[in-house]
């Protein structure tokens, strides 16, 4: 039987990264020697202290619950480590009811829409932006208003440019700084304006802080929760994936507004069974060891960032070095007339290099492409050698 899928799935565009994997498979089948530098999935292993804690916890004979549902017997050490981390890193004090453990950011973002949005509600998401914001809205039956992130404004949301009718109707506004895909960063004054915007318009500010710890040249990214009163109108999504090389582990947390946190916890109670206890113990170890673990990881990305930026600039791109994230965001060469899809397709056919076309992040991502730094130096070097040949 050919089952007809739900209408909500039919409303979704092809998922960007699934589409990239399909394109790669098709190219390899044609005999193309592919170099993929498109997806942000760390190539280096999870740090030893975290792995060792996982192994200890999963084998611990004293823990009779170690293989049981993570939701029924949660690890108290992880939310405590979260609160300690937020206090040490940001100076933010969180109550127990302001934190919930998640299976990474992606799951949490999609589930969160079910917690706070009703069919027909309006939600604001950035363009370009992480596709899962809009995907969550579709699952909840909500409608997305895309607010443009413009190069002329440093890829920051312009709150004043959001129409009054949108402000009146919207229930949530998504922010993401350091930003994927643009690599833009925001200062604490920007977050103060965001909190005031949320308070004035009765809009929940949802800040995706997935890249807040991937920073370079001494830069430290702020948290929206550092703003006085932010926990009244904002939540912040954290992930251990990129900061600790733990993408496959699927663990993170949501912090902030207690009622919104309670809403996500209710969705999770009814849709999943939590995170394996051993992973929670290991995640607590990661957060407790943040100061020792994260700097060496960032040093690798900073070196790769310099490698990529220097190579592109030597061939005429004129890019600034991003202060954060694990990406490089660049305009497509002029001969492609602003078409990121045309550039990405031609690059693959001519050189075998796969980058992410900016259009995949929304209409305002058009004209740009994204490179991920989660590939070995020699792979990035070879990819740059191939890319610069297309510049003319």
Where are the predicted features?
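PLP-dependent enzyme catalytic core of the Aspartate aminotransferase-like
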Residues: 84, 88, 337, 346-356, ...
């Amino acid at each position: 039987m050919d089952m007809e899928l739900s209408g909500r799935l039919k409303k979704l565009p092809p998922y960007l990264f699934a589409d990239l994997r399909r394109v790669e498979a098709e190219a390899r089948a044609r005999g193309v020697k592919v170099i993929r530098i498109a997806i942000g999935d760390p190539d280096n292993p999870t740090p030893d202290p975290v792995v060792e804690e996982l192994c200890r916890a999963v084998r611990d004979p004293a823990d009779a619950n170690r293989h049981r549902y993570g939701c029924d017997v949660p690890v108290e050490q992880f939310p405590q480590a979260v609160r300690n981390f937020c206090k040490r890193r940001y100076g933010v004090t969180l109550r127990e009811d302001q934190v919930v453990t998640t299976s990474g950011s992606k799951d949490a973002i999609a589930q969160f829409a079910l917690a706070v949005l009703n069919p027909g509600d309006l939600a604001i998401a950035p363009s370009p932006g992480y596709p899962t914001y809009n995907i969550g809205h579709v699952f909840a039956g909500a409608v997305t208003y895309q607010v443009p992130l413009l190069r002329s404004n440093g890829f920051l949301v312009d709150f004043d440019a959001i129409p009054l009718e949108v402000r009146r109707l919207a229930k949530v506004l998504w922010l993401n700084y350091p930003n994927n895909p643009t690599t833009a960063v925001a200062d604490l004054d920007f977050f103060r304006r965001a909190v005031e915007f949320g308070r004035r318009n009765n809009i929940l500010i949802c800040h995706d802080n997935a890249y807040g710890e991937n920073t370079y040249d001494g830069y430290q990214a702020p948290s929206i929760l550092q703003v006085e009163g932010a926990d009244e109108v904002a939540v912040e999504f954290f992930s251990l994936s990129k900061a600790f090389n733990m993408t496959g582990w699927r663990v993170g947390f949501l912090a902030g507004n207690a009622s919104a946190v309670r809403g996500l916890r209710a969705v999770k109670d009814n849709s999943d069974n939590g995170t394996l206890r051993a992973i929670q113990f290991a995640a607590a170890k990661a957060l407790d060891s943040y100061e020792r673990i994260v700097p060496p990881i960032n040093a690798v990305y900073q070196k790769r960032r310099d490698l990529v930026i220097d190579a592109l600039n030597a061939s005429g791109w004129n890019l600034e070095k991003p202060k954060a994230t694990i990406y490089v965001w660049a305009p497509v060469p002029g001969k492609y007339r602003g078409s990121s899809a045309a550039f990405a397709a031609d690059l693959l056919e001519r050189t075998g290099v796969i980058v992410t076309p900016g259009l995949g992040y929304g209409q305002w991502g058009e004209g740009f492409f994204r490179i991920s730094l989660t590939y070995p130096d020699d792979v990035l070097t070879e990819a740059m050698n191939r890319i610069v040949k297309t510049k003319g």
